[in-house]
């Protein structure tokens, strides 16, 4: 599916400023694509990143089979997101070429180790 078609198929969620999308450690597996607005990713009460339109968040659980969320995600302003269901993400990952999955997971694992080591 083309990225531009996502909002034709999936639900859109609107967050108000300072509304929490998800908390670190939560176990739901939905992903999100930001349509408008910005989301802060917070780890240990430190803002690690601010994401904006076109960026995707909340998908690490599916890619790594993690049990919980790595960050808390908070809207910096009114924000519209497309909800990417966990089953949809799992289906996409399961159909990916095994070599590409290996490369992607290796890169993400290295990134995650770096982030955890830099705290």
Where are these regions (language model features)?
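Short proline/glycine- and basic residue-enriched helix-capping loop/turn segments at helix->loop/beta transitions
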Residues: 1-17, 81
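Short, surface-exposed beta-strand-loop junctions and turns on beta-sheet-rich folds
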Residues: 40, 47-49, 88-91, 98
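A small-molecule sensor/coupling module
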Residues: 69, 89-119
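Exposed alpha-helical structural elements
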Residues: 1-5, 88, 99
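Cyclic nucleotide-binding regulatory domains
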Residues: 11-77
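Residue-level detector of alpha-helix boundaries and kinks
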Residues: 2-3, 22, 92
């Amino acid at each position: 599916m083309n990225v531009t078609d996502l909002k034709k198929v999936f639900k859109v969620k609107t967050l108000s400023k300072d509304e929490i999308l998800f908390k670190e450690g939560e176990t739901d597996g939905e992903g999100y694509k930001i349509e408008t607005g910005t989301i802060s990713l917070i780890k240990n009460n430190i803002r690690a990143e601010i994401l904006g339109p076109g960026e995707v968040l909340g998908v690490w659980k599916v890619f790594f089979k993690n049990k919980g969320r790595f960050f808390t995600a908070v809207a910096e302003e009114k924000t519209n997101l497309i909800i990417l269901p966990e089953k949809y993400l799992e289906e996409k990952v399961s159909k990916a070429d095994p070599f590409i999955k290996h490369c992607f997971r290796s890169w993400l694992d290295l990134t995650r180790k770096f982030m955890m080591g830099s705290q």
